[in-house]
From Swiss-Prot, chain A:
GO terms for cellular component: cytoplasm; nucleus; proteasome core complex, alpha-subunit complex. The 26S proteasome consists of a 20S proteasome core and two 19S regulatory subunits. The 20S proteasome core is composed of 28 subunits that are arranged in four stacked rings, resulting in a barrel-shaped structure. The two end rings are each formed by seven alpha subunits, and the two central rings are each formed by seven beta subunits. The catalytic chamber with the active sites is on the inside of the barrel. GO terms for biological process: proteasome-mediated ubiquitin-dependent protein catabolic process. Gene3D superfamilies: Glutamine Phosphoribosylpyrophosphate, subunit 1, domain 1. Pfam families: Proteasome, Proteasome_A_N. Belongs to the peptidase T1A family. SUPFAM superfamilies: N-terminal nucleophile aminohydrolases (Ntn hydrolases) (SSF56235). The lineage of its organism: Eukaryota, Viridiplantae, Streptophyta, Embryophyta, Tracheophyta. It comes from Oryza sativa subsp. japonica. InterPro entries: Ntn_hydrolases_N, Proteasome_alpha, Proteasome_alpha-type, Proteasome_alpha1, Proteasome_asu_N, Proteasome_sua/b. Residues 239-270 are annotated as: Disordered. This is Proteasome subunit alpha type-1. The keyword Secreted does not apply. Residues 245-256 have a biased composition (Low complexity).
Length: 270, 262
């Protein structure tokens, strides 16, 4: 009668050792439009593909400033994402009030993950249906974390989440080794290229993406988390397209990789 | 500075048998609890200043029970974490409580095991919040605290020296003196302090201040402790005494030239 007897509440295990509700929440992340994040030693960049729900509506915001030194990009249920970014903001502001110093990014990601974890262990709760890329700056440099509804979190050099993010990941995997020494400008370009991979033929313009950056200049001064101006994004996109056309457009290779579903991934695998 | 100077409200005139509850000064915190509203065992001045390699801090090792010099060998300067020193004037048990708070903080940093640690600026800010919060509960921690330290920041090594007192007043300075030192040592520090002092010069200056305090502050004793904090960490030196000279004319005949009845 029931297709699955083990997915009616979050805390019930399947005999195979899986928590279906948690996995469903992780599926929700894949439904949202894509986000990418990447970092050098000194800067971290977040970018998101914006998709309007209908022709008549505007898109939802997917990139949020948390504090001067940190921000998030989210994929999945944006409503859940807003709740979590408000939580992050209050954690940061409380830490700043008490210690007069920014909350280290690793601690920020940890608190977020702990909050998500609680939802996987309480029968009266549901997991958050949102994945967050947390980018920020602290004493040890720039950082990028991915926070999953399961309560797992990982640090990355570069990562992508959301629908068709596999294409962006493939792009990033080819190039991440040089990212540590990238300039902010180079990071932004790669972020845009990665986002473009997820659009599947749709044209990348400044109106269907958001880019934000945080980092530290060589002299130690902080460049606070900031959305990059629409005009500047368009300029960068234009310059990228110009550069692409110059060396005889190298056919849109066979990069039409679909998402890697189908494979029997281990339950907690991202 | 450290405790109320109105003679008719002198804490030492209050009964010590716990009958504060009937007095207007006591604050009851629900039934059955009664908090200390006055200092009992107090330490005197702390002197601290930045020098070339870090921050130096000094005090005597005395603690008074009222005006009785009751304890002669207490450490009023302690290391906090890896980057800071804290020195305290005022109520000694309140200082011990503050040390417990700070231990808790550094221990939890250690347990997170993520490489993050509190620098002197963070410790100072934290203590500012604690002190002001307790003052607002009318249950102050009866201290003047000095926080000094060095920590590597994005712009290189950064020296830090700040203080906070029992009512939450707080500031940063190149040289700080609490208690009687605020009156007696600050003028000396203002004229003689330099940014690029060597440790030896700093010790000389600090000793000059301590000696003046020894001559003029009745609650100071001739047993001093010096501590320094640099990038290498904190060093608290064993106590020692200074050579005194009581043959000054003003000491021989203090009443001479003094206008007044004494």
């Amino acid at each position: 009668m029931f297709r699955n007897q083990y997915d009616t509440d979050v805390t019930t295990w399947s005999p195979a050792g899986r928590l279906f509700q948690v996995e469903y929440a992780m599926e929700a992340v894949k439904q949202g439009s894509a986000c990418v994040g990447l970092r050098s030693r000194t800067h971290a960049v977040l970018a998101a593909a914006n998709k309007a729900a209908s022709e008549l509506s505007s898109h939802q915001r997917k990139v949020f400033r948390v504090a001067d030194h940190a921000g998030v990009a989210l994929a999945g249920l944006t409503a859940d994402g807003r709740v979590l970014s408000r939580f992050l903001r209050s954690e940061c502001i409380n830490h700043a009030f008490v210690y007069d110093a920014p909350l280290p990014v690793s601690r920020l990601a940890l608190r977020l993950a702990d909050k998500a974890q609680v939802c996987t262990q309480r029968s009266w709760k549901r997991p958050y249906g949102v994945g967050l890329l947390v980018a920020g700056l602290d004493e040890s440099g720039a950082h990028l974390y991915y926070n999953c509804p399961s309560g797992n979190y990982f640090e990355y050099q570069a990562f992508a989440i959301g629908s068709r993010s596999q294409a962006a990941k493939t792009f990033l995997e080819r190039r991440f080794e040089g990212y540590n020494d990238y300039t902010p400008e180079q990071l932004i370009k790669d972020a845009l290229s990665a986002i473009k991979e997820t659009l599947q033929g749709e044209k990348l313009t400044s109106s269907n993406c958001t880019v934000a950056i945080v980092g530290r200049k060589d002299d130690g001064t902080v460049e606070p988390f900031e959305m990059i101006d629409v005009k500047r994004i368009q300029e960068i996109i234009d310059s990228m397209e110009a550069a692409e056309e110059a060396p005889a457009a190298e056919a849109e290779s066979s990069s039409m990789q679909e998402e890697d579903k189908g494979t029997d991934a281990a339950p907690m695998d991202i | 500075m450290r405790f109320g100077s109105d003679s008719d409200q002198d804490p030492w005139q209050q009964p010590m048998d716990g009958s504060h509850a009937s007095g207007s000064k006591a604050v009851a915190d629900g039934p059955g609890t009664q908090r200390t509203q006055y200092p009992y065992v107090t330490g005197s001045s702390i002197i601290a200043l930045k020098y070339k390699d870090g921050v130096i801090m000094a005090s005597d090792t005395g603690a008074s029970y009222g005006s009785t010099l009751r304890y002669k060998s207490v450490e009023r300067i302690k290391a906090v974490g890896k980057h800071s020193l804290i020195g305290a004037s005022g109520e000694f048990s309140d200082f011990q409580e503050i040390l417990r708070y700070l231990d808790e903080l550094t221990l939890s940093d250690h347990m997170w095991d993520d490489g993050n640690s509190l620098g002197p600026k963070e410790v100072h800010s934290y203590l500012t919040r604690v002190m002001y919060n307790r003052r607002n509960k009318f249950d102050p921690l009866w201290n003047s605290l000095v926080i000094g330290g060095v920590k590597k920041g994005p712009k290189g090594e950064e020296k830090y020296l700040g203080m906070v007192n029992m009512i939450g007043t707080h500031f940063e300075e190149n040289h700080i003196a609490t208690g009687f030192g605020n009156h007696m040592a600050i003028p000396i520090l203002r004229t003689e302090w330099r940014e690029d002092m060597t440790f030896e010069e700093a010790v000389k200056l600090v000793e000059k201040c301590l000696l003046v305090l020894l001559y003029r502050d009745r609650s100071s004793i001739n047993k001093f402790q010096i501590a320094k904090i640099t990038t290498e960490g904190a060093t608290i030196y064993p106590p020692y005494s200074l050579k005194t000279y009581w043959g000054f004319a003003a000491f021989e005949n203090p009443a001479q030239g003094a206008v007044g009845s004494w």
